[in-house]
Amino acid sequence: MNSLANNGKLYLSLKKLNFPKEWSYPVNPNTSYIIDTFKEAVKCGIFLESNKKHFEYSYSILTVIGWFFPRYNYEQLMIASSVMQWIFVLDDFLERDHIDDEKQQYCVNKCEDILIQGRKSEYISNIADADLAPLDKYTLLLRDRLSKSTKDRVETFNIFIHYLREWFFSVIPLKKSKGESKSDSVHYDVYTFIRTVNVGLYFVIAINNVAVDLKIDGSFWMNPIWSRMTRNASRLFTIVNDCVSYAKEIDQECAGENCLYILQIKSNLPLQTVYNHLVDEFDQIVAKVQKDEILLLESFNYLPNEKIDGIKYLILSLKELLVGNYKWSLVSPRYIHKDSPFIETSRSDSSTIPYETILTPDIFWI
């Protein structure tokens, strides 16, 4: 792989991906949600409490919540962490090579229907509680938590479910887009279009709509300036995530879903040149987000302060997510790899967990 410079020395740094200095946010000091979220998944049968690797898997996922939502209280953190744990478990399941197309599609359709209808879903309505598959139990738990938080705000619940289902319906198309061979790569523009949804920023920012009573109209989520901001922010998410996962995805022969690899193959350029191109794009997109922040607030200057405050909360949260994702990615064991071309994530660590091998289908799916 073209990840090392001459003599095997690392030559790339993720510090070239810069955010404005004023975008500096602390990590949420509350960490009690981590063990509580893990225990809920254990109760549903997703994990085994006695299995150390299961806890490490869960812990590595849930730590991101503290980086994403530094202002959340415990109850809000529990909402966000249950969403994130559900997402990662489902994503890791769908990306397994031994899960055929039919089972993947069945899984997606089933999750969608349970989120929409709950216990009335035709997939589980005739199954006793004790006989439900672990992931079904956890999906019901998640839906119940979301419903309780939005019991007087049905519109906000529907908006969040919309973004959530958009995400999990993007997983299979992205996987299929690269062709039959694992090393194939999709056209870059096609990849960017699918990955904008698949990277997950839309549903992550929409967690605020469930966890926080923002006092804003549902129509705000369709505002073209806000839509452009979140689309551009999704691109920033993608660049960071693809950089830190580059070596791992090449190692697992699934780099056809990685923007660095796609640009290398399609443009026949060395990794360093491709990375410099992405750094330039990153800087340009950050500037666009800053410009749209001003435009967005100006376009709503007629609203009462209560609603303006809700919009300002979301804008700040968007920036917290961007910075939090970047900082978390640099320290998460999920992205450590001995062949990483980036100094910050390249090392051999005996404690690093091969996440793709931890959860077997019989543990969390029947």
Curated annotation (Swiss-Prot):
Taxonomic source organism:
Dictyostelium purpureum
The protein's matches in InterPro entries, at most eight in alphabetical order, are given as: Isoprenoid_synthase_dom_sf (IPR008949), Terpene_cyclase-like_2 (IPR034686)
Task: Please indicate if the UniProt record lists Metal-binding as a keyword.
Answer: yes
Q: Where is this motif: NDxxSxxxD/E motif?
A: 241-249
Keywords per UniProt: Lyase, Metal-binding
State the gene name recorded for this protein. Answer: TPS4
EC code(s) of this entry: 4.2.3.-
Name listed for the protein in its UniProt record: Terpene synthase 4
Taxonomic placement: Eukaryota, Amoebozoa, Evosea, Eumycetozoa, Dictyostelia
- Family, similarity comment: Belongs to the terpene synthase family.
> What does it do?
Terpene synthase that converts its substrate farnesyl diphosphate (FPP) into the sesquiterpenes bicycloelemene, beta-elemene and 2 yet unidentified sesquiterpenes.
Q: Does the keyword Metal-binding apply?
A: yes
> What one GO molecular function would you report for this record?
metal ion binding
- Catalysis: reaction(s): (2E,6E)-farnesyl diphosphate = (1S,2S,4R)-beta-elemene + diphosphate
Residue interval(s) of motif DDxx(x)D/E motif = 91-96
- What is any one GO biological process for this UniProt entry? terpene biosynthetic process
What does the UniProt entry state concerning the protein's domains? Contains several highly conserved motifs that are important for catalytic activity including the aspartate-rich 'DDxx(x)D/E' motif and the 'NDxxSxxxD/E' motif, both of which are involved in complexing metal ions to coordinate the binding of the isoprenyl diphosphate substrate in the active site.
